[in-house]
Amino acid sequence: MTQPVTGTSATAAPLDLRAAIAAILDPEVPVVTIEDLGILREVLVDEQARTVNVLITPTYSGCPAMDAIRAHIEHVARRHGYAATVQTRLSPAWTTDWLSAAGRDKLREFGIAPPGQRSEAVPRPVGLSLMARRVTCPLCGSVDTQEISRFGSTACKALRRCNSCREPFDEFKAI
């Protein structure tokens, strides 16, 4: 479930500011916005004080993209005539379930396999199976893929290869 971008205001300028902040691209995966990723948690605009408070949650603790995202939020706010305060909240921890459907589509169209849904926690014993995960190739649609390396071009991606079209591709890891 994507976490909503919230805030209240009746005028267009803050809505434009919210939209501009939500449209900031992730520097490590520049086809998805911070809203698509679900890391943009809240945008609160104070028109009188000309300030905006933005709450973000990193995809993982120590994510190097967060400094660039914070700087970009501050730049966008200044461009709109606002001072920005950007806060990072680690709890609840970000999950790939917060990726929007549009974000998943953008990843796939860019050649990155989007993550599957996480398993839900249940208060009882669960059975385990030793079956390989089925990851669909974003290039040809085959599920005959294999993991080449658990560590891809960024910490949030793994490197895979399609056994049908033989092309390598990134997989966005499910967290």
Segments from the language model and where they lie:
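Domain-level signature for proteins that mediate thiol-based redox and metal-cofactor handling
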Residues: 1-175
